């Protein structure tokens, strides 16, 4: 109901805010920040200690913060997918990763039902809110070794850093026993730092350049 709507509103705000921050600070850094925001917000939700107005506001506020973290997650993740995954695999990878949102919602629902039936209701719903933060802690350790997006680095003039990131990725591929074919120089594209674009450019892109896609995307979320 209203709590889910607040969470969704937080996702929208988080996607806009952290998406822009991701363009400035990098995908890898935002992977850690947004996950930390979600962990903080969702973890605090479990510590709502009453039903009076103050605690209800606290619960809504923490769910909004958790939603911001998830919205920022998808902004950073989808940017990284677009920049690092080859075009012929990009759609499948995108569906697979974004599909985990709905898979996680289903798993979380059944887990919450389990907790509510096994433990007292006052404890069961809190445990449901703590599932996500516990998984987030594990994911933080996994993400520590992720390289920065070489394309993002090139767009920000970090040529040496981009080459180092590519070397790291290629080393991991070779470690798994795969051979990399030489790159055809004729397929190379020139990349250089671009101008900084704000929210006004985004609005024009959505409602002037691609209005049908904007309506379709909004309809799917509703």
Identify the role of each PLM range.
Residues 1-222:
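Transmembrane-helix signature of 12-pass secondary carriers
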